[in-house]
Every structure is written in structure tokens, then in C-alpha cells.
Amino acid sequence: MQILNGKETALTIREELKVEIDGLKEKHGRAPGLAVILVGEDPASQVYVRNKEIACEKAGIVSTAHRIDASVSQEELEALIQKLNADDTIDGILLQLPLPKGLDSQRCLELIDPGKDVDGFHPMNVGKLMLGLPGFRSCTPAGIITLLERYNLPTSGKKAVVVGRSNIVGKPLAMMLMQYGDFANATVTVCHSRTDNLAEEVKAADFVFAAIGIPKFIKKEMVKDGAVVVDVGINRTDEGLVGDCDYAALEDVASAMTPVPGGVGPMTIAQLLINTVQAYKEHVGA
């Protein structure tokens, strides 16, 4: 079985971007700028933000974290977003989710300038994905497509099953797989908690994308021989971090698979860097 190593791939992408950013900085007088908004003290969010800061620093992107107390009002948070929208040194704005109770995350996401929406969550960018128009794509599904490209695993003409229908992963990934291109053009089925005969649907897939949030949900008997399995899940259990797939059991049947950790997670951050550089280039006219 081939291991789809997201950690190594993300490192390669970061090094490539560093070279590109160095050249752009020399030509345009500044580096790309990313603003990250973190509200409250959710431990997982703090780890994610720190990892993003480290990746930005190593790639040459100027990352500014706005750490805000959970008691912030909706109006104050919206004012910060508007301020960042107007800041010409900021190319990307990332609102770390989830927000504490009492804050309207959808309202905040809709306030972000679509040209700075490097997370790809603004309705305008979601709509552009639906229409097949250029725009920012959600980082996790876009990172998955990038990983498949790097390992030359085209989905064109293949049956792909996405297990999970979240707005962050499942829905946008399904839409990306239905676009035109070698690493799209798939026949896509989306499964979820109400799907009848879910195991049968997964068994028919050439590509399985598991994003359901249940530890080791995808079993060996659910996957056909030679399938490519992409595990989006990150679940904390007594045995440590595990994915949505039973990795050890699937090694006997999958032709290629992402590990957890070290698979999709690093690619999400790599795609954030790619999107931020894209936003920067559009802003400076590169």
C-alpha cells in the first residue's frame, strides 16, 4: 500500500512557496500578509492557530494573530474584520472556528472581503465553486485534491464516495470532484448518517473520502481491493489520534491511503499558504 504522506508533501509545497515569495517580495516590496482571528481559549483552536503561524513564518508569509477574549461582542468582532478588510498589507483573513456561543459565525464569515477569504467560506466563493468559476476553495478539500495531484492519482472517470456532508469538507469536496479536469471528473456519491446501505455505497468506490467524525468507522469489509482511501478524520481516543478509517485493517485492501496524523491535516495548512499567496498576487497585480 502506498502511503499518501501529507506531511512531506506539505513541506515540499512550503519550500516551493518560500522561493516564490522571496522573488515576489523583492519585486513588490512586501511579503504576503495573513491575519488570523482567534476568539476565546479553545485548546484545539490554539494548536491549529500556532501550527498555521509556524507554517507562515517558514514560508515567508507575515502572519498576525488577533487573540481576543471570549467576552468580545459581535459588534467588536465585526469592527475588527472591517478594519482588516481595509488594511492593504493584509491579503488573507482567517476566522478560526468554532466561535464561542453568542457570536454569529456565519455573519462574520460573510463580512470578510471575498478577495481575502483564504479559507473559502464566503458565500461568494462557495457559489463560484458551484459554478466552476475561479475563486478561493476551502482549504481541506482543496488540499486533498492537491495531494492526489502530487501523487498522480487522477479521479477522472472514477467512482468517488464522500462520507460526510459538512460545509467545510464534505460538500465542497464533492463539488470539486465534479469539476472538469484529471483530478476531478469523478462520478460522486455523498453518504451520511441517513444513507441506506452505506457500506455497499463505499464498497463500490474507487476513491473513498472519509469525513464523518467517527473513529475507525470505515472497516476493511467496506472497501474494495485497490481503492484509494483519504481519511479526513482526526479523533482523540484513549489510544491517541485516530482517523475515521481502521488504518491497520485497510492496509491489506487499499492501494493508497493517508495516515492520521500526517495525512490531510498538513495539506490543509499547505493549501492555506497557497491561497494566501494567490490573494497576495491578485492584490499586487503579480
UniProtKB/Swiss-Prot annotation:
EC assignment: 1.5.1.5, 3.5.4.9
GO terms under cellular component: cytosol
Residue positions binding NADP(+): 164-166, 193, 234
Record keywords: Amino-acid biosynthesis, Histidine biosynthesis, Hydrolase, Methionine biosynthesis, Multifunctional enzyme, NADP, One-carbon metabolism, Oxidoreductase, Purine biosynthesis
Biological processes per GO annotation: L-histidine biosynthetic process; methionine biosynthetic process; purine nucleotide biosynthetic process; tetrahydrofolate interconversion
Catalytic reaction equation(s): (6R)-5,10-methylene-5,6,7,8-tetrahydrofolate + NADP(+) = (6R)-5,10-methenyltetrahydrofolate + NADPH; (6R)-5,10-methenyltetrahydrofolate + H2O = (6R)-10-formyltetrahydrofolate + H(+)
Annotated InterPro entries: Aminoacid_DH-like_N_sf (IPR046346), NAD(P)-bd_dom_sf (IPR036291), THF_DH/CycHdrlase (IPR000672), THF_DH/CycHdrlase_cat_dom (IPR020630), THF_DH/CycHdrlase_CS (IPR020867), THF_DH/CycHdrlase_NAD-bd_dom (IPR020631)
Pathway(s) served: One-carbon metabolism; tetrahydrofolate interconversion
UniProt keyword annotation of Protein biosynthesis present: no
UniProt GO MF annotations: methenyltetrahydrofolate cyclohydrolase activity; methylenetetrahydrofolate dehydrogenase (NADP+) activity
Tagged with keyword Amino-acid biosynthesis: yes
Described function: Catalyzes the oxidation of 5,10-methylenetetrahydrofolate to 5,10-methenyltetrahydrofolate and then the hydrolysis of 5,10-methenyltetrahydrofolate to 10-formyltetrahydrofolate.
Cited HAMAP family: THF_DHG_CYH
Subunit structure: Homodimer.
Family to which this protein belongs: Belongs to the tetrahydrofolate dehydrogenase/cyclohydrolase family.
Descriptive protein name: Bifunctional protein FolD
Annotated organism of origin: Maridesulfovibrio salexigens (strain ATCC 14822 / DSM 2638 / NCIMB 8403 / VKM B-1763)
